[in-house]
Amino acid sequence: MTVQLLHLSDLHFGGLADLDQIEALEQMLPDLRPDAVVVTGDLSQRARHGEFQRARALVQVAARTAPVLVIPGNHDVAWWTRPLIPLAKQPLYAKYRRYFGADLVPTLTLPGAIIASALTSHGVSWGSLTLQLRDLAVKGHLPKRELARVRGLFDSAPREQARVLVVHHNVLRGDISRRMGLARWRQAQRRIVASGAEVVLCGHDHEEGAELLGGRVVVSTAGTLCKRTRGGRPSTFNFVTIEPTAVHITYFRWDVESRRFRASDTYAFARVGKGAAPAPAPAPPPAQPVSADTTSHS
């Protein structure tokens, strides 16, 4: 069974979001016909009510087309309210939960896939502390307990379902930024591979990516729909197609002249058991929309 996922990230409502791009996305959503829409965090800029309200409006529009799974990013966590109280983290997510529900790690089950999320945005936490002051509350942390929970979900799912892991922080190094989104990233990568995930959806770095982790896990890193792109690149979102034998990731890039998103590069990976490998043949692009053609920013 084929599963198609529209992968968005880093919208940054609150001054950075490009409203023309948001409108174009809303118009083309029905024509893309995804089975689900996944938003991998940073819906807001400063975790303010008005920013979350605008982000929720977009999620509600997307939900008319397909189920939507949303997770918080580091910008959605009001870490400054309790920066040094590690046991008082729940208030940090209060505003986010008001608009997107109490569950910070939702799971979505489709006929052909189980999509499980893990929380990497904790504000200031022991697991994400680094020697770089600019990374205070920016770096992510992927705790062992999170991956153990996800692995339990994957282990109990029917074999024919693709295993998709959703996190905010980029799990591979950005080509332009040369930065890892996660602290203790080597440990995190090993845990991801061991979890049984076949596909990872992430964002944070404001640069699109389609790569393999550990030689077998397909990683879709979505760009951003805000005005602060990495290296001045066009804004992007990803369209992920999971087939029984392959995974395809297509970038939709913003075209300034037409003011529309257009399908551009497509990357293909062959599915081998519960893993993947680069596929030698190019993949076809996803269905083209009728109404539209087709960064520390973190």
Which residues make up each language-model segment?
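Extended active-site neighborhood of metal-dependent phosphoesterases/phosphodiesterases
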Residues: R54-R149, R191-V193, F239
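Conserved beta-sheet core of the metallophosphoesterase superfamily
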Residues: S177-T245
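N-terminal active-site segment of His-dependent metallophosphoesterases
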Residues: M1-A63, W79-W80, R145, R149-G152, ...
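Active-site-proximal segments of metal-dependent phosphoesterases and phosphodiesterases across multiple
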Residues: S128-L136, H141, A157-V199, D205
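A short C-terminal boundary segment appended to hydrolase-like catalytic domains
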Residues: I242-S298
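Active-site environment of divalent metal-dependent phosphoester hydrolases
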Residues: G14-A17, Q45-G50, R54, P72-R82, ...
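Active-site neighborhood of phospho(di)ester-bond hydrolases with catalytic His/Asp-centered motifs
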Residues: L8-S9, V37-D42, P67-N74, L119, ...
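Beta-strand-turn-beta hairpins that frame and shape the catalytic cleft
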Residues: M1-L6, P106-S117, P158-A162, L213-V219
